[in-house]
Amino acid sequence: MAVLADIKGVGLGLKRELIPQIQRLFNDKDVPDSKIANINFVEIAPENWIGAGGKASADLAWFVERYPIACHGLCLSLGGPDSLNVDFLKQVKQFLSANKIPLYTEHLSFCSDIQNGKAGYLYDLLPIPFTEEAVKYVAQRIRQTQDLLGQRIAIENTSFYVSAPISSMAEIDFLNAVLTEADCNLHLDVNNIYVNSINFGFDASQFLRRIPGERIVYSHIAGHLQVDAGLLVDTHSENIIDPVWALLDEAYQLFGVFPTLLERDTSIPPLPKLMIEVNKITDIQSQYASNNSPAGQYQSGVRSRP
């Protein structure tokens, strides 16, 4: 069974169109192992796989046998006004156990609302107001989630485009307060830091330096769409730009090497082109191979809380 420490090195988001490409290269004896050797783990959204049967179930089983898997949720709505979806979390718990998946993460956002007494999904990830009240509310829901799952989760810093007018805290202060109050781990999204820094005019490096590095379990890096000079959209559809690569490099300098996953959700190129960015992450990590444990918190590339 995979354990948290197996999530290490470089990962790739597992999209349906990539499955046959990875399987073909993995099974082709005439293809050098180095073609996909730098894919050390994969990530899936549990919502897309819970209850899957037939070929989808067989594909998942194939990856479970060959790769450590991280689950990155989409619809828990940690900041939502409706009650936490306990039935869904029970499904997640069973899914994690059945597929030997050691890690579950979610977005620090909300994607549900209540109208006329009925809860419904908004199909987008929206920012939580950055207030002390929201810190306590979200942290309680994270603790409840951890209790129901019987394990720690990690929350991801999200991109957003409109800040709530009632916010009274900076994003980094809100994030750190939630992490402390909930005592959970951090799923660090490097591209989201950069996107928000451009959209809201703060220094991405200063934000990064205030991250509690000992809570990082793994990170995302991705491309984004530039709409205009002051507006970036986190589309996961483009190649990663140099300032985002530089921010990842800076994060490794600050915190040591942590597992990092390439996100590509739309306009997905053939696997060999994706491997160019996967291999670049590996190259950057190799520059800091002797800096895996600056504070003694890393274990096999994954930090754990004492």
Feature map (PLM): residue ranges:
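Acidic-and-aromatic substrate-binding clefts and catalytic sites of carbohydrate-active enzymes
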Residues: 17-20, 45-56, 77-87, 161-169, ...
